[in-house]
Amino acid sequence: MGKILVTGGTVFVSRFVANYFAQKGDDVYVLNRNSKPQLPNVTLIEGDRNDLGDKLKGYEFDAVLDITAYTREHVEDLVNALGKFGDYIMVSSSAVYPETNPQPFTEDQDCGPNVHWGPYGTNKLAAEEYLRQAVPHAYILRPPYLYGPMQNVYREPFVFECAEAGRKFHIPGDGSMKMQFFHVEDLCRFIEILLEKHPAERVYNVGNLDAVTISDWVRLCYDAIGTDLETVSVEGHPQRAYFCFHDYDYYLDVSKQIALMPDVKPLAEGLKESYEWFRQHRDGVIRRSYMEYIDTNI
């Protein structure tokens, strides 16, 4: 049993990660402001990561899982506030790759601004750069779109609600835009492998091996509920006004991940798990007005 610090621990990825390792028998601590209900099987360290002071100096962790680092300052403040620790794993983002890079994106490509992600991507990159200098043995993970139980972002839940209501689904263009996903449990499994095997590589793209078109992803969401899908092609409207992803076709080379973890959860299976969680936790999703835009403008 290890002693693990998870930053966050109250919503989606950080909550799932904390729960995953706690259920494995690890001694899990979560660092957050205590503004939301806590998991029952973790120890809370109440604090704002922007103002930690000496809250962490009395602790010694086998691993730090930094799920909520969005800026250089986030990483710098946490690293400086920690006492003794072993491994450090930061969940970064594929948004660090410029959209002009050849695809699939590989870990050895240059990183920089991406017009679709803006400051989110450049801030993640600055956080990565500081971490690599301050903690050379740290691991950095660059996922595409994460999904699965505890999802609070209105992505697959949006499609689920359209399917439940028997709505036609409004697809951007011909539906051929490709996206890549990674189940949050697979993220946890890969973190577990890093902690066990300590491979020499320090930066990993993570994700499903294959990208999927919008049309196929929506169909899988409808299939998860058992609802027939009828689509309407949309042109001439801003995509983010009526759809839950940017107008941005990209995917990652995840061969380094696959070498360590060959099996990942099939998207169809993962979406069924997502729907089962959503059915029981509808109030945990932050909704956006996609349906209202469609009904009023399309």
Task: List the model feature ranges, each with a label.
Residues S93-G118, Q133:
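Active-site "gating" loop of Rossmann-like NAD(P)-dependent oxidoreductase/epimerase domains
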Residues N34-M90, V96-P98:
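NAD(P)H-binding glycine-rich loop region in Rossmannoid oxidoreductase-like domains
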Residues D247-I298:
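C-terminal amphipathic/interface module of NAD(P)-dependent oxidoreductases
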Residues I193-F245, D249, R282-G284, R288, ...:
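Mid/C-terminal beta-alpha module of Rossmann-like enzyme folds, strongest
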Residues I4-K24:
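N-terminal Rossmann NAD(P)H-binding glycine-rich loop of SDR-like oxidoreductase domains
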Residues T7, G148, P172-M177, Y204-V212, ...:
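Glycine-rich Rossmann NAD(P)(H)-binding loop
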Residues F160-H170, M177-V212, R219:
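Alpha-helical substrate-binding/gating segment
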Residues E128-M150:
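Conserved beta-loop-beta element that borders a ligand/cofactor-binding pocket
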